[in-house]
Amino acid sequence: SMTIYDNKGWVVVNNSHVIFAIDLNTFKEVGRIENLTSPRYIHFLSDEKAYVTQLWDNRIFIINPKKYEITGYIQVPDMTMESGSTEQMVQYGKYVYCNCWSYQNRIIKIDTETDQVVDELKVGIQPTSLVMDKYNKMWTVTDGGYEGSPYGYEAPSLYRIDAETFTVEKQFKFKLGDWPSEVQLNGDRDKLYWINKAIWSMDVTASHVPVRPFLEYSGTIYYGLTVNPANGEVYIADAIDYQQQGMIYRYSPEGKLIDEFYVGIIPGAFCWK
């Protein structure tokens, strides 16, 4: 993943156990943080403090971005190193919320003053995304695991969670065998998008998921999704077959194709400057 902070791009490379800080104009490295386990996402609390989630580790790392140093750890309860999985983070007041994905079923709540997990909320099997809308409602979608999984297999769901009370307000259920992922918000944070073979969209105040998708499934592999925060245009990454160059499609907010272009192999994430 990549996050922009302090006029730098922070590129989190999980397989290389490192975070690179790069110049946004030249893409040249200006610093790095090493000795991470398998970093996934970074969330900045201040110029001198950030959290880094991990795969295959039961700790969230605390780092000092100015010094490019690891300064501490947050131990996640009831999680082993082998089953460790923390992912995306959102913040409400002094609390940071994080979804626990691989062989997990929880959203955890972290007090940023004490760097301790103070609460957790159980959802379905393997919550894959976490975003916060304009009404301070968190959204996560579960993938339901897979058939034969030792952790279980169930129909996935989309959840709306109130950040103030840390309770589930609404659960939107999918069919067994569906594989929803990549929950995103538009710039106004009042419209939700996600992938479930097709591309789907709905208002954050909706009472049910739509019957028709925003974009129909075309037999390809939609692998990444983002929405331009300035104009609402939707960008979709197509992995095609995981072997050749991927394709990016750009659509208007009304679902009309504007542009398409090739990128590298398996495009999966976007970052807006």
Predicted regions and their residues:
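Predominantly soluble domains enriched in secretory-pathway, periplasmic, or organellar proteins
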Residues: S1-K273
